[in-house]
A protein has these predicted regions:
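Phosphopantetheine-dependent thiolation modules in NRPS/PKS and related acyl-activating systems
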Residues: 2-36, 40-79
Length: 79
């Protein structure tokens, strides 16, 4: 799966999960940039992404994620 397809699907997930179609998903996007992205939303986001991309992340991998670009790279490495 290429980066464009990953970001397309991530954008859909972010819009749905945060109920905000104005979110622009970029590699530099972080939790600080999205209203409502707290620890609980983060867990829901990871679970939703795992289901959508049919992948499973370890706790260590999740803890290392700092921005959406890191997440997209992790997804691509599993695809």
């Amino acid at each position: 799966m290429d980066q464009e397809a990953i970001y397309e699907k991530l954008t859909e997930i972010f819009h749905d999960l945060f109920d905000d179609d104005s979110i622009v998903v970029t590699p530099e996007l972080t939790a600080k940039d999205v209203e409502g992205w707290d620890s609980l939303a983060h867990i829901r986001l990871i679970i939703t992404i795992e289901k959508a991309f049919k992948v499973k992340f370890s706790t260590t991998e999740i803890a290392k994620l700092e921005k959406v670009g890191d997440l997209a790279a992790l997804i691509q490495s599993r695809a």
